């Protein structure tokens, strides 16, 4: 209390102030973001890379959302649902590829849902995410955690070459797992070269085996490891060949293990080739080989590496598209590619090895298999615009670009001379950085443009709607409904796939045994149906010519001595394949009648009562003769000759939207 009688605060000791400050700091510690900011600042490159990968996955998920299964996809899925899980199934080659990994994944997936595009896309994107993380991990090990590694990571993430491949599920499940295995094998192999630890060699061998399980191009991964080891993992001497010889000697254990894996795979491949529809053979035209090689480089790989091809040529139906770069941009792209290569070699003489690494992969992994298996059967011009062939080269391109422009992290031992960093050299470095940034921006813009252009000319909606309608039709149709079997649209599955292009496979596998499929309708079939081009189930009708109408008072066409002559209102089409007969069989038991036409006679089973019968014929007819073969009398009311088609004016399952 003061002398005036007023209360005054008690003096606070320094200890109490410190205690108060500590308590306040603890109370507001949750709001202190300094440590978080420091962490992000320290790990900004990794954070930026993760953000890039997340954006890429979202972008590619949106890309996949407008596509659907096509061609090989349906074949692989239907093969999986029909096959037991055994060695014969997983080593089945088919169209020329030993794809054990895909067979296993497809077998498991179809037992969850046969045509589940969402699930299939999720599997593909999971591999994409894993491959991108593997690329980030490898780039950090090779070049350190520096902002520059975001450039090859960006190229790998957005390269349009990979998008058509990703959009076809069977191709994606070959290429993307191979890319993951390649990146992981390179990382483990480099660790082994540097440390000589057995666990790294074991990891590298496992990833080489994984690559082989998913794609025969995995045979080239050990070759890539050898070129990489001899070219960059040891101090370069006089020749690359000499460096590779030294690498062979120093790491002989690795090469022996890789060779054993390759030999074992080749044995399995050779034993499985009898299930392949195509077999390796020497090309019969050097000109076709040259056309393919030049086309794959100038129309697909080089434009794609620079963000192209900028425009596409869609197949009929729009389920896929080939590269169709503008003529002017082809030559601009080639010029830019040459300039980039020359500049990189001028800056780092060893860079030529990096580009040779990329070209070597393209030649060995992407060109040679096509040259020895596809050149004779398909147009070389078309094959040269097939970007799927070089999709697996994108990770090699990203690695090669990094090796061409930057030293390995282990080589950066000397600190830069600050005096030499001034003046002309500093200005040149700044200008080079600006040019490089501009080129990366152009590639980024071109990649987005190219992918959007691909989306504009392709769509999976027709196939998706077809399968959705067919699924609903099978659920709603009575069990045992007779359905005329025919091929699905070639946009979905081409006739080259044989029986796997038939509706009884593509649609029938949705509910095996639910419908009664008829390849060649014959005999008495009431309520015959057909699937229309939209996947809905329609009643079948004959498109052609009808019999002359009954005269007034008649219920049957004239029958003399069990013989009915059916006159049509003109001649049927030249490719007539069937006759439909509406009849009444006057008997208590089934019987047979013969249907005669100029090209032959068909016996047709009939049933008591009012029914519809079909007989297969060949060629144009103007009349047929129906004759009872005993056991009853037949009354023919009407007939048509022509070919079956879906009657889209009648009832439909499921009902079409109004």
What residue spans do the PLM features occupy?
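Transmembrane alpha-helices and membrane-interface helical segments
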Residues: 137, 184-191, 225-230, 258, ...
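Short hydrophobic alpha-helices at membrane interfaces in multi-pass membrane enzymes
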Residues: 191-209
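Transmembrane alpha-helix segments characteristic
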Residues: 349-378, 439-443
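Membrane-interface micro-motifs in multi-pass membrane enzymes
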Residues: 72, 99, 148-190, 213-215, ...
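Transmembrane-lumen/periplasm boundary regions of multi-pass, lipid-linked membrane glycan transferases
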Residues: 259-277
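Transmembrane-embedded, aromatic-rich helix segments that form part
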Residues: 202, 216-234
């Amino acid at each position: 209390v003061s002398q005036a009688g007023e209360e005054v605060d008690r003096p606070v000791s320094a200890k109490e102030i410190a205690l108060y400050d500590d308590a306040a700091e603890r109370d507001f510690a949750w709001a202190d973001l300094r440590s978080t900011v420091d962490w992000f600042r320290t790990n900004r490159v990794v954070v930026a890379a993760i953000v890039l990968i997340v954006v890429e996955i979202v972008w590619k998920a949106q890309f996949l959302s407008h596509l659907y299964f096509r061609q090989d996809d349906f074949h692989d899925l239907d093969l999986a649902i029909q096959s037991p899980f055994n060695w014969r199934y997983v080593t089945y080659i088919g169209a020329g590829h030993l794809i054990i990994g895909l067979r296993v994944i497809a077998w498991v997936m179809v037992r969850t849902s046969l045509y589940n595009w969402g699930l299939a896309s999720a599997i593909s994107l999971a591999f994409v995410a894993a491959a991108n993380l593997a690329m980030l991990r490898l780039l950090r090990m090779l070049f350190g955690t520096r902002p520059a590694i975001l450039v090859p990571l960006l190229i790998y993430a957005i390269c349009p070459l990979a998008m058509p491949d990703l959009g076809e599920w069977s191709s994606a499940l070959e290429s993307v797992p191979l890319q993951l295995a390649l990146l992981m094998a390179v990382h483990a192999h480099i660790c082994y070269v540097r440390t000589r630890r057995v666990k790294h060699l074991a990891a590298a061998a496992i990833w080489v085996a994984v690559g082989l399980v998913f794609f025969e191009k995995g045979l080239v991964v050990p070759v890539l490891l050898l070129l990489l080891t001899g070219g960059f993992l040891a101090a370069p001497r006089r020749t690359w060949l000499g460096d590779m010889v030294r690498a062979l000697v120093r790491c002989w254990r690795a090469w022996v293990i890789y060779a054993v894996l390759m030999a074992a795979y080749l044995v399995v491949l050779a034993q499985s080739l009898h299930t392949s529809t195509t077999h390796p053979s020497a090309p019969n035209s050097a000109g076709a080989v040259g056309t393919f090689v030049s086309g794959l480089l100038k129309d697909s790989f080089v434009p794609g590496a620079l963000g192209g091809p900028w425009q596409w040529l869609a197949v009929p139906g729009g389920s896929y598209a080939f590269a169709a770069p503008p003529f002017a941009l082809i030559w601009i792209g080639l010029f830019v590619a040459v300039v980039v290569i020359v500049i990189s070699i001028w800056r780092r003489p060893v860079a030529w090895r990096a580009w040779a690494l990329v070209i070597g992969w393209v030649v060995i992994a992407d060109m040679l298999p096509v040259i020895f298996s596809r050149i004779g059967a398909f147009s070389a011009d078309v094959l040269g615009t097939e970007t799927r062939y070089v999709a697996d080269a994108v990770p090699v391109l990203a690695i090669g670009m990094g090796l061409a422009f930057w030293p390995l992290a282990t080589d950066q031992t000397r600190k830069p001379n600050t005096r030499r960093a001034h003046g002309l050299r500093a200005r040149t470095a700044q200008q080079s950085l600006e040019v490089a940034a501009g080129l990366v921006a152009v590639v980024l813009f071109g990649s987005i443009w190219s992918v959007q252009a691909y989306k504009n000319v392709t769509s999976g909606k027709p196939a998706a709607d077809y399968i959705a309608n067919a699924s609903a039709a099978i659920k709603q149709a009575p069990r045992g409904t007779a359905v005329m079997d025919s091929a699905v649209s070639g946009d979905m599955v081409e006739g080259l796939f044989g029986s796997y292009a038939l509706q009884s496979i593509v649609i029938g596998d949705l509910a095996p045994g639910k419908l009664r499929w008829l390849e060649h309708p014959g005999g008495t079939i009431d309520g015959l149906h057909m699937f229309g081009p939209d996947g809905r189930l329609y009643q079948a009708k004959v498109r052609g010519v009808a019999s002359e109408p009954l005269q007034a008072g008649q219920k049957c066409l004239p029958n003399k001595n069990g013989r009915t002559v059916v006159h049509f209102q003109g001649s049927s089409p030249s490719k007539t394949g069937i006759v439909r007969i509406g009849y009444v069989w006057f008997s208590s038991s089934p019987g047979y009648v013969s249907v005669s036409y100029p090209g032959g006679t068909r016996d047709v089973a009939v049933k008591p009562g009012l029914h519809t019968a079909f007989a297969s014929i060949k060629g144009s007819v103007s009349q047929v003769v129906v004759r009872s073969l005993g056991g009853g009398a037949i009354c023919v009311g009407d007939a048509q000759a022509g070919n079956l088609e879906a009657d889209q004016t009648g009832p439909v399952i499921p009902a079409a939207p109004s």
